[in-house]
Amino acid sequence: MAETLQTGKPIDFSIMPSFYCNLRCWFCMYDCSPENRRVLDYKKTKVFISKFDWKLINAFGFYGGEPSIFTHSYEPFVCLIPDEIPRFVITNGTWSVSEDYTELFLNWCAKHRFHIIVSSTPDHIKYQNRVFLENLAKELDGALELKNPDEIHAQGRAKGHDGVISDCKLTCQRTDRNIRLGLKPDGNIVFQNCHGEYHVVQTYEDEFSGIIERTNQIVGKCYKQKIEKNEKR
């Protein structure tokens, strides 16, 4: 999970404009790949975003899919977000092996004042120029962050994979993180604080108003079921 600077606002919201990716990681929770070209409906997203109460938004993220190979499709969605809202982008870092892609991607990130978060599992690192990224992180001094290696959870393609344990660590109950919500290309909005299942909270055709209450209701029901299940063991 990406860590964001806490400002007292309760929601970190993200948009996944596409699941198109130049990698096919065995553990991808969103089943991203070079063949997955499904994209988010811009008009419906624009209507939904126009109803946001921006006082509730701590930070706004973009990922998917790999943003660096599809910036022209991400661009219209980025432009929907008010300039004063902190933004971050999560990338697999493959752009670092090409001078041309590096320049294009970093210029795009600078244009939108993105905090850049680079995935750092062994499966990502082998497709990166890691030394370059480490030096760049020092040079940009906080603007680019190399993630700690993610713990692989039983979601997406990792579900049922040998060595991946399906468990619940009740991370939904942590008080040091905001509510994390992500809009997927199919229009579903999922709760992303969980290490197990990403519950669908609503769609982008529903109202933004009440999204926190709906999230808390779904999470509370799941938490109660987990506690009751543990007590029966």
Protein language model regions, located:
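N-terminal [4Fe-4S]-dependent radical SAM core
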Residues: 1-14, 54, 168-170, 178
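Conserved glycine-rich "GG(E/T)P / GGGxP" loop and the immediately following alpha-helix
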Residues: 12-18, 23-150
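Short, compositionally biased leader-like segments
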Residues: 143-163
